[in-house]
Structures are given as structure tokens and as C-alpha cells.
């Protein structure tokens, strides 16, 4: 079982929203069961697509629902202007009782932004990435960050431009809708289940990309 939390981490020039939220810190969202280590949702409704699985208390560096140095950001990015950049981070955790096998991640780029292809060109390249290719996807996996390319090459990520469905390459992938504005795909492979918060470090990580406000 994979638990995921998607958060925005602020505009290009500020990390504080117009409502006063600090997107450079931890924000507990009362309507999100999964963004803390408090077990308050243990009998999920299988028909609830927003909260389909049990809650977890295995996020790293997270204390209850009061603090976290891992789950940084919020779901409300505040008021932004065209041309500004937003950074999106999807935190993942293998939170089940068994290893999660053949994990394929897909996230559609929000309709209000345009994917920035070279956001992480200065990051540490991932293994197998094409030399000289733009790197617009950042991955934390197995305790290390790696900047991944947008193209089909030897690394484990790919950006699909609008109109090209990831399912044409990965028939079983689920992106929750048509690819109308771009989609980010990462092949995470097998993820061992977390046995304690942050243990093992191969059980959790994050995927990050940036978009420019239209």
C-alpha cells in the first residue's frame, strides 16, 4: 500500500501565502488524514476515492499532527501572478504490511501552470539519464536526491507532454484523467514497507516538479 501527499511549496518570490500560511514549514491540513503520524482513520470506505486506505504513523521526522521536517508545504499555494513559479512535491510512503511491488507513479500537471523542463538541471543527475538532457523532475529515493530527465532514456522518470497518454507506454498506470496539460511519471519499482517512522529509508521519498503560472 502506498500513501501519498501532494503539497505546494510556494511561489518563486515568497513562501508565505496571502492567508499567512508558511509553505516552507509543516502545515497540518485538518481534512487530510494522511499528512501526519496520528492514527485517526483506520476503517476506510473502499468507495472513498480521496481516502481509500488506512491512516499511517510511519512518516519520517514527523511528530503526531504537530510538527514535521519532512512533510513541508501546503495544499493552498495562495494568490500568485502569471509568470511566477510554483513547486509541487508529492511525498510517498510504503505504508502497508507488505512490500509494495512494481510501483508506477503518475501525476498530472495542474491546468493553471506550465511544466518547467529545466528546473533541476543543476541537481545531481540520476543514473542512466541522457547527458545534456533537461531535468525537470527531482526524486528523493533511498535517502538520496537525484535530478531526472524528462525524456525516455535510462533513468526512471519521464515527462509526457499534453495529449500523450502515459498508458501508451505503461498500460497499467493510473493518472486519474486524460493528459490535457502534461504528466510526470516515475517508475519507483519495489518499495519495502515502513516498519517504523523513517525505517527503512527505502520505504519513503518524494517527487518534485515546478510549474509556471499561466
Model region roles, listed by residue range:
Residues 1-214:
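Exported/extracytosolic protein signature
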Amino acid at each position: 500500500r502506498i500513501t501519498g501527499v501532494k503539497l505546494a511549496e510556494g511561489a518563486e518570490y515568497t513562501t508565505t501565502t496571502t492567508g499567512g500560511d508558511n509553505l516552507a514549514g509543516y502545515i497540518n491540513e485538518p481534512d487530510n488524514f494522511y499528512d501526519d503520524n496520528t492514527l485517526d482513520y483506520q476503517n476506510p470506505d473502499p468507495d472513498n476515492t480521496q481516502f481509500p486506505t488506512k491512516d499511517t504513523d510511519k512518516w519520517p521526522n514527523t511528530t503526531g499532527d504537530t510538527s514535521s521536517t519532512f512533510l513541508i508545504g501546503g495544499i493552498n499555494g495562495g494568490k500568485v501572478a502569471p509568470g511566477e513559479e510554483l513547486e509541487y512535491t508529492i511525498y510517498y510512503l510504503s505504508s502497508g504490511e507488505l512490500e509494495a511491488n512494481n510501483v508506477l507513479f503518475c501525476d498530472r500537471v495542474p491546468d493553471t501552470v506550465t511544466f518547467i523542463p529545466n528546473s533541476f538541471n543543476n541537481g545531481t543527475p540520476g543514473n542512466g539519464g541522457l547527458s545534456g538532457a533537461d531535468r525537470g523532475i527531482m526524486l528523493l529515493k533511498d535517502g538520496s536526491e537525484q535530478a531526472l530527465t524528462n525524456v525516455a532514456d535510462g533513468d526512471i522518470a519521464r515527462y509526457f507532454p499534453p495529449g500523450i497518454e502515459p498508458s501508451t507506454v505503461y498500460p497499467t498506470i493510473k493518472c486519474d484523467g486524460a493528459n490535457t496539460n502534461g504528466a510526470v511519471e516515475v517508475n519507483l519499482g519495489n518499495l519495502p514497507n515502513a516498519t517504523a517512522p523513517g525505517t527503512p529509508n527505502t520505504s519513503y521519498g518524494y517527487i518534485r516538479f515546478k510549474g509556471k503560472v499561466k
